[in-house]
């Protein structure tokens, strides 16, 4: 019985890596060993940055809410606004608040007024 060398499987595996490395610079795009290292590192970055993206968007929403709150009332800060929301029983997440602040300022102003009224004087 002849030996099975698995050339088809190896070729398919190598092709998968080199296809993933398309667009890379230099030997990273066509040398299998270097391409595999580059693709592995790219996957590490992708995994890390999927986590970081959530943090960055939350920070962006907070900045937008803070700017809109201060534009509505200079004495009111972001933290006091969020406290007022919880005291008023308004359960709207930061993503929706930031979207309202950008696209529907009148509705956001109404929410700010309700949160401000709920704060202790």
From Swiss-Prot:
Disulfide bonds: none annotated. The keyword Ribosomal protein applies. Keywords: Ribonucleoprotein, Ribosomal protein, RNA-binding, rRNA-binding. Pfam families: Ribosomal_L20 (PF00453). PROSITE patterns: RIBOSOMAL_L20 (PS00937). One of its GO terms (cellular component) is ribonucleoprotein complex. GO terms for molecular function: rRNA binding; structural constituent of ribosome. CDD domains: Ribosomal_L20. GO terms for biological process: ribosomal large subunit assembly; translation. Belongs to the bacterial ribosomal protein bL20 family. PANTHER family: 39S RIBOSOMAL PROTEIN L20. HAMAP family: Ribosomal_bL20. Binds directly to 23S ribosomal RNA and is necessary for the in vitro assembly process of the 50S ribosomal subunit. It is not involved in the protein synthesizing functions of that subunit. This is Large ribosomal subunit protein bL20.
């Amino acid at each position: 019985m002849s030996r099975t060398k698995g050339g088809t499987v190896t070729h398919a595996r190598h092709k998968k890596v080199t296809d993933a490395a398309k667009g890379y610079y230099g030997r990273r795009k066509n040398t299998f060993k270097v391409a595999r290292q580059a693709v592995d590192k790219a996957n590490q970055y992708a995994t890390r940055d999927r986590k970081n993206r959530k943090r960055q968007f939350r920070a962006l929403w907070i900045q937008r809410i803070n700017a809109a709150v201060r534009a509505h009332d200079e004495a009111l800060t972001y933290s006091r606004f969020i406290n007022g929301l919880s005291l008023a029983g308004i359960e709207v997440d930061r993503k929706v608040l930031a979207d309202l602040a950008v696209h529907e300022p009148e509705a956001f102003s109404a929410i700010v007024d309700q949160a401000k009224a709920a704060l202790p004087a």
